[in-house]
C-alpha cells in the first residue's frame, strides 16, 4: 500500500511516550481554519517545524503519521475540482441566505457537516492554506514575471476520524533528544 506522510507539531511537555501512545491530538483552537479535527501538514516536515516555531513558541515535538496515498474519504479542497466547485456553489448560496454574515471556510464546512451526509462520506478535509506561510519557498517561472511555483505548498489535513490514519503509525521524529534508543 502506498502511503502519504503527514506531520503534526504538538507542544513539548517532556512526555514522549504519552505523545506517541495518544496522538494525534485534536486542535482545540476556536479559530481552526477547517473546523474541529486533528490537524496535520501534508508531506513536508518543514511546515510542521514552521508551525512549531510560530504557534508553539519553539517548544514542540513533531510526529509523523500516514494516510493511504490515494486519499480515500477525503474532502479535497486542494486537488479535487468537483469538491472545489461544489464548495464554491455552496458558499455563494450561503452568502445569499445569510447576507449580513461573513461566510468563512469553517462556516461552510460546519453547514456541510450539519445539513448533509458529509461526516458519513468523509473522514478528512484537505486544503491549501494560501498565504499562511510568508517564507514559502518559491521558484519563478520567468525572471520578470510574478508567477511562481511553491516548492513546499502549505497543505493541511483536518482529520475528522482517526481511522483515516494508518493504525499504529504515529511516531516522534523531532526533537532528536526523543530519538535516542530506549527513550521512546
What are these regions (language model features)?
Residues 5-14, 40-45, 66-71:
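Short, flexible loop/turn elements at secondary-structure junctions
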Residues 17-25, 49-71:
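Short, charge- and proline-biased low-complexity linear segments
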Residues 8-9, 20, 62-184:
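Active-site and NAD+-binding cores of ADP-ribose-processing enzymes
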Residues 17-20, 41-46, 136:
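A short linear-motif detector with a strong N-terminal bias
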Residues 2-4, 35-38, 59-60:
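Short, surface-exposed beta-edge/turn micro-motifs
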Residues 28-55:
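Extended catalytic/binding region for NAD+/ADP-ribose chemistry, centered on the ART fold
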Residues 1-33, 53:
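ADP-ribose/NAD+-binding catalytic cleft of ART/PARP-like enzymes
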Amino acid at each position: 500500500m502506498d502511503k502519504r506522510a503527514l506531520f503534526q507539531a504538538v507542544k513539548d511537555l517532556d512526555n514522549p511516550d504519552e505523545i506517541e501512545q495518544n496522538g494525534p491530538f485534536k486542535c482545540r483552537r476556536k479559530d481552526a481554519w477547517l473546523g474541529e479535527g486533528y490537524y496535520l501538514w501534508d508531506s513536508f516536515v518543514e511546515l510542521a517545524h514552521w508551525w512549531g516555531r510560530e504557534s508553539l513558541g519553539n517548544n514542540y515535538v513533531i510526529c509523523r503519521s500516514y494516510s493511504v496515498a490515494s486519499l480515500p474519504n477525503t474532502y479535497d479542497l486542494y486537488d479535487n475540482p468537483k469538491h472545489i466547485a461544489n464548495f464554491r456553489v455552496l458558499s455563494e448560496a450561503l452568502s445569499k441566505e445569510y447576507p449580513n454574515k461573513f461566510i468563512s471556510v469553517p462556516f461552510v464546512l460546519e453547514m456541510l457537516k450539519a445539513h448533509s451526509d458529509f461526516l458519513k462520506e468523509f473522514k478528512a478535509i484537505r486544503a491549501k492554506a494560501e498565504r499562511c506561510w510568508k517564507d514559502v519557498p518559491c521558484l519563478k517561472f520567468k525572471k520578470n514575471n510574478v508567477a511562481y511555483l511553491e516548492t513546499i505548498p502549505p497543505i493541511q489535513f483536518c482529520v475528522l476520524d482517526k481511522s483515516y490514519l494508518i493504525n499504529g503509525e504515529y511516531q516522534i521524529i523531532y526533537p532528536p533528544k526523543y530519538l535516542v534508543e530506549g527513550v521512546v
